[in-house]
């Protein structure tokens, strides 16, 4: 404690400063183009992928990026196709955010964030045409493959959609389906015990997110940065660097120059 002109001044360690006034702490860091995890304002976390990590799944992958850890296991089951799509299979993605990955998530029903991300994953699979669903059909009107993609966050630190998608995409690339045929005499599917085939992906799709804090764009925001931000923008590109999807949350409207900048950055990162 120091005394200046008879007035006592308090000094705090960075950790205490962060707890007392998190907004001012983040603003102080960003003015120096640095963040609490050491990245610059425009820097994305590097993703490390380990695939085929679950021996009992048809496909799997675990990704790590900073403090984030997401794992995806894909299980293939056979079901009767829907009446309105008799020659197609389908994919069911689901994200689990449990109290084990962050204290902000509570036991019980899925959190709002988990439900929103799961829905966005499902819509993205449809909009991107990543998988030809007809390739999942075994026999029209009788049998098709259903891919249940369970994505579990083991440790959470922001940008849930980006990393859930990264884990899902990495796992899809490893899927092996048993060679299956429809036996009309037995009226059931016969699967080969050893022969398998991959799921053909039409392109590669990547997701890039930003948040806005104090009029500053934060690439790949952490959990703490998301809590303090007012706007969020996600841009998804395919391997041709064409836009697959744009997700905007918070705020009023996207400034054209801001959107253009984010698109340019995303394309440079692909």
Swiss-Prot record:
<dbReference type="InterPro" id="IPR015847">
    <property type="entry name" value="ExoRNase_PH_dom2"/>
</dbReference>
<dbReference type="GO" id="GO:0071028">
    <property type="term" value="P:nuclear mRNA surveillance"/>
</dbReference>
<keyword id="KW-0698">rRNA processing</keyword>
<dbReference type="Pfam" id="PF03725">
    <property type="entry name" value="RNase_PH_C"/>
</dbReference>
<dbReference type="GO" id="GO:0000176">
    <property type="term" value="C:nuclear exosome (RNase complex)"/>
</dbReference>
<dbReference type="GO" id="GO:0000467">
    <property type="term" value="P:exonucleolytic trimming to generate mature 3'-end of 5.8S rRNA from tricistronic rRNA transcript (SSU-rRNA, 5.8S rRNA, LSU-rRNA)"/>
</dbReference>
<dbReference type="InterPro" id="IPR050590">
    <property type="entry name" value="Exosome_comp_Rrp42_subfam"/>
</dbReference>
<keyword id="KW-0271">Exosome</keyword>
<protein>
    <recommendedName>
        <fullName>Exosome complex component rrp43</fullName>
    </recommendedName>
</protein>
<dbReference type="GO" id="GO:0000175">
    <property type="term" value="F:3'-5'-RNA exonuclease activity"/>
</dbReference>
<dbReference type="InterPro" id="IPR036345">
    <property type="entry name" value="ExoRNase_PH_dom2_sf"/>
</dbReference>
<dbReference type="GO" id="GO:0071038">
    <property type="term" value="P:TRAMP-dependent tRNA surveillance pathway"/>
</dbReference>
<dbReference type="GO" id="GO:0016075">
    <property type="term" value="P:rRNA catabolic process"/>
</dbReference>
<dbReference type="GO" id="GO:0070651">
    <property type="term" value="P:nonfunctional rRNA decay"/>
</dbReference>
<dbReference type="GO" id="GO:0034473">
    <property type="term" value="P:U1 snRNA 3'-end processing"/>
</dbReference>
<dbReference type="GO" id="GO:0034476">
    <property type="term" value="P:U5 snRNA 3'-end processing"/>
</dbReference>
<dbReference type="GO" id="GO:0070481">
    <property type="term" value="P:nuclear-transcribed mRNA catabolic process, non-stop decay"/>
</dbReference>
<dbReference type="InterPro" id="IPR027408">
    <property type="entry name" value="PNPase/RNase_PH_dom_sf"/>
</dbReference>
<dbReference type="GO" id="GO:0005829">
    <property type="term" value="C:cytosol"/>
</dbReference>
<dbReference type="InterPro" id="IPR033196">
    <property type="entry name" value="Rrp43"/>
</dbReference>
<keyword id="KW-0539">Nucleus</keyword>
<dbReference type="Pfam" id="PF01138">
    <property type="entry name" value="RNase_PH"/>
</dbReference>
<dbReference type="GO" id="GO:0034475">
    <property type="term" value="P:U4 snRNA 3'-end processing"/>
</dbReference>
<keyword id="KW-0694">RNA-binding</keyword>
<keyword id="KW-0963">Cytoplasm</keyword>
<dbReference type="GO" id="GO:0005730">
    <property type="term" value="C:nucleolus"/>
</dbReference>
<dbReference type="InterPro" id="IPR001247">
    <property type="entry name" value="ExoRNase_PH_dom1"/>
</dbReference>
<dbReference type="GO" id="GO:0005634">
    <property type="term" value="C:nucleus"/>
</dbReference>
<dbReference type="GO" id="GO:0071035">
    <property type="term" value="P:nuclear polyadenylation-dependent rRNA catabolic process"/>
</dbReference>
<dbReference type="GO" id="GO:0000177">
    <property type="term" value="C:cytoplasmic exosome (RNase complex)"/>
</dbReference>
<dbReference type="InterPro" id="IPR020568">
    <property type="entry name" value="Ribosomal_Su5_D2-typ_SF"/>
</dbReference>
<comment type="subunit">
    <text>Component of the RNA exosome complex. Specifically part of the catalytically inactive RNA exosome core complex (Exo-9) which may associate with the catalytic subunits rrp66 and dis3 in cytoplasmic- and nuclear-specific RNA exosome complex forms. Exo-9 is formed by a hexameric base ring of RNase PH domain-containing subunits and a cap ring consisting of csl4, rrp4 and rrp40.</text>
</comment>
<dbReference type="GO" id="GO:0071042">
    <property type="term" value="P:nuclear polyadenylation-dependent mRNA catabolic process"/>
</dbReference>
<comment type="function">
    <text>Non-catalytic component of the RNA exosome complex which has 3'-&gt;5' exoribonuclease activity and participates in a multitude of cellular RNA processing and degradation events. In the nucleus, the RNA exosome complex is involved in proper maturation of stable RNA species such as rRNA, snRNA and snoRNA, in the elimination of RNA processing by-products and non-coding 'pervasive' transcripts, such as antisense RNA species and cryptic unstable transcripts (CUTs), and of mRNAs with processing defects, thereby limiting or excluding their export to the cytoplasm.</text>
</comment>
<dbReference type="GO" id="GO:0000178">
    <property type="term" value="C:exosome (RNase complex)"/>
</dbReference>
<dbReference type="GO" id="GO:0035925">
    <property type="term" value="F:mRNA 3'-UTR AU-rich region binding"/>
</dbReference>
<comment type="similarity">
    <text>Belongs to the RNase PH family.</text>
</comment>
<dbReference type="GO" id="GO:0070478">
    <property type="term" value="P:nuclear-transcribed mRNA catabolic process, 3'-5' exonucleolytic nonsense-mediated decay"/>
</dbReference>
């Amino acid at each position: 404690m120091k005394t200046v002109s008879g007035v006592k001044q308090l000094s705090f360690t960075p950790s205490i400063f962060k707890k007392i006034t998190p907004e001012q702490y983040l603003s102080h860091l960003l003015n120096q183009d640095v963040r609490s995890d050491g990245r610059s304002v425009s820097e994305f976390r590097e993703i490390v992928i380990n695939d085929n990590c679950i021996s009992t799944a048809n496909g799997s992958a675990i990704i790590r990026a900073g403090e984030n850890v997401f794992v995806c296991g894909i299980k293939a089951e056979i079901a009767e196709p829907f009446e309105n799509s008799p020659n197609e299979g389908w994919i069911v993605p689901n994200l689990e955010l449990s109290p084990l990955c962050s204290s902000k998530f509570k036991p019980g029903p899925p959190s709002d964030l988990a439900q929103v991300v799961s829905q966005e994953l499902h819509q993205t699979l449809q909009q991107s045409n990543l998988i030809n669903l007809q390739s999942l059909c075994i026999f029209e009107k009788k049998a098709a493959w259903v891919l249940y993609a369970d994505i579990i966050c083991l440790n959470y630190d922001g940008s849930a959609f980006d990393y859930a998608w990264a884990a899902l995409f990495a796992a899809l690339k490893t899927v092996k389906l048993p060679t299956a045929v429809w036996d009309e005499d037995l009226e059931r599917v016969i699967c080969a015990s050893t022969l398998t085939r991959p799921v053909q992906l039409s392109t590669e799709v990547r997701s890039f997110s930003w948040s806005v804090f104090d009029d500053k764009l934060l690439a790949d925001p952490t959990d703490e940065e998301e809590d303090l931000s007012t706007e969020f923008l996600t841009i998804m590109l395919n391997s041709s660097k064409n836009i697959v999807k744009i997700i905007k949350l918070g705020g009023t409207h996207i400034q054209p120059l801001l959107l253009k900048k984010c698109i340019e950055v995303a394309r440079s990162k692909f």
